């Protein structure tokens, strides 16, 4: 083996298996390129530059391999595939639009049936 050499298996490695995906048309209406990473909460991605149905993107990220990104040049329009976040479905940071549970029913003030005024469910 040569230093720095990669030895890859011939078969494709599956990723994001078992997640339902949606297709969403996205347009960069800005004057500069925009990149969005694989695990970025797509709902919160560049509000000024990217135009798409944000309600469809709530709780979802790009269906691309971890550590990669997509780039949309100024004026470019394309269709992307999005999948749900897994795990405990909590999102923090990004553009600070969520900073908590993704599945909170704001009208009912509950999280999966737990009243928010009491506390979040115990972590297991």
Swiss-Prot record:
**Where are the disulfide bridges?**
none
- Which UniProt keywords are given for this protein, alphabetically ordered? Cytoplasm, Hydrolase
The entry lists its GO molecular-function terms as:
urease activity
Catalytic activity reads: urea + 2 H2O + H(+) = hydrogencarbonate + 2 NH4(+)
The record lists the lineage as: Bacteria, Bacillati, Bacillota, Bacilli, Lactobacillales
Name of the encoding gene: ureB
Which locations, inside or outside the cell, does it occupy? Answer: Cytoplasm
Q: Source organism's superkingdom?
A: Bacteria
**What EC number(s) are associated with this protein in UniProt?**
3.5.1.5
Q: In which pathway does it act?
A: Nitrogen metabolism; urea degradation; CO(2) and NH(3) from urea (urease route): step 1/1
Supply the name of the protein: Urease subunit beta
Xref: HAMAP family: Urease_beta (MF_01954)
Which NCBIfam families does this UniProt record tie to the protein?
PRK13203.1 (NF009682), urease_beta (TIGR00192)
An individual GO BP term: urea catabolic process
How would you summarize the oligomeric state and partners of this protein?
Heterotrimer of UreA (gamma), UreB (beta) and UreC (alpha) subunits. Three heterotrimers associate to form the active enzyme.
Q: What class of enzyme is it?
A: hydrolase
Q: Which Gene3D superfamilies match?
A: Urease, beta subunit
Per the similarity annotation, which family is this? Belongs to the urease beta subunit family.
Instruction: Quote the CDD domains the UniProt record gives.
Output: Urease_beta (cd00407)
Answer yes or no on keyword Cytoplasm. Answer: yes
Q: What are the record's GO terms for cellular component?
A: urease complex
